[in-house]
Amino acid sequence: MASQVSAVDDILSEYHGLEQQMADPELHNDAAAARRVGKRYSELQPIINVHRDLVSAQEDLEAAREMAHEDHEFQAEAERLEVEVVELEEKLADLLAPRDPHDGEDIVMEIKAGAGGEEAALFAGDLLRMYQKFADKHGFVVEVLDSAESDLGGVKDITLSIRSRQPSRDGAWSQFKFEGGVHRVQRVPVTESQGRIQTSAAGVLVYPEPDEVENVEIDEKDIRVDVYRSSGKGGQGVNTTDSAVRITHLPTGLVVTCQKERSQIQNRARAMQVLAARLQAMKEEEAAAEAATGRAAQIRTMDRSERIRTYNWPENRISDHRIGFKANNLDSVLDGELDDLFTALQAAERAERLEAEG
């Protein structure tokens, strides 16, 4: 409890300091600094609110107990407040628990069709729609940066940006970070005339997006920039200028493309953001792999080739192999109802973090 009090005191001090910064007109002359301060302020706000509610409930409980000595009618109120205080203490402890430092950040997501031809591309399209529906329900903004469709309207490869509408301690990363890995589907493909169940797969990559590209060191000498004419479905030209951008990071071989914007400058800026996210993730994953040597694999795996989940159409079942989660509501999940699964994954990660801290 003493450590919790100390943590709250530190947060209160930081919060008041942020309030003073936000009241300073000079801050708003620096957009990047204002964004950082506003984001941190939003991250601390839930802790401040719960702490205030807890202090108020504790004061009310003390008063109710005193009055209950003289008037037994206040005993019920005291008992209600005792329950409220315990609930708020648990909520505050949860908010103060160790967190992933990227949880408040936006993300870049890539979905790639795996083995299985058209069927794999159609499944990748199903995953795309599932994530889009979940994002819409939870107030995230989805932006397609680059995509390639299959002949039947599936997704061969797509790159997305998923962002919070407002700064929050529970950003897109806190929700989607567990999705990286191989997703497997079992169903009868639309191209199968004999009604046989087949297995196909799609790969999902997820990276936290840095607040500023400048926060990730990228030497201009290490990149090659190619421009080309953006195209739509089937290669049909949709832009008569060379506005699409392909950036190759020579030391790592990473390639990023963006053709969403009509301006080459805008596409280059977005491609650089995606490259920064991928390089940052690569660096952090290398460090995490070193730190995890000899330790059990984490819930959010660093192995992008690992099969993390199976979607079984005939049995309407979804299975997450990392935590043993199973549910027979595949239709709802594909409609964006991922809350139960994500909550289970978050709980497993939280338990893992607490164990590591202990």
From Swiss-Prot:
It comes from the Bacteria. It comes from Corynebacterium glutamicum (strain ATCC 13032 / DSM 20300 / JCM 1318 / BCRC 11384 / CCUG 27702 / LMG 3730 / NBRC 12168 / NCIMB 10025 / NRRL B-2784 / 534). This is Peptide chain release factor 1. One of its GO terms (molecular function) is translation release factor activity, codon specific. Keywords: Cytoplasm, Methylation, Protein biosynthesis. SMART domains: PCRF. Its main location: cytoplasm. It is found in: Cytoplasm. HAMAP family: Rel_fac_1 (MF_00093). Gene3D superfamilies: 3.30.160.20, 3.30.70.1660, 6.10.140.1950. The modification N5-methylglutamine is found at residue 236.
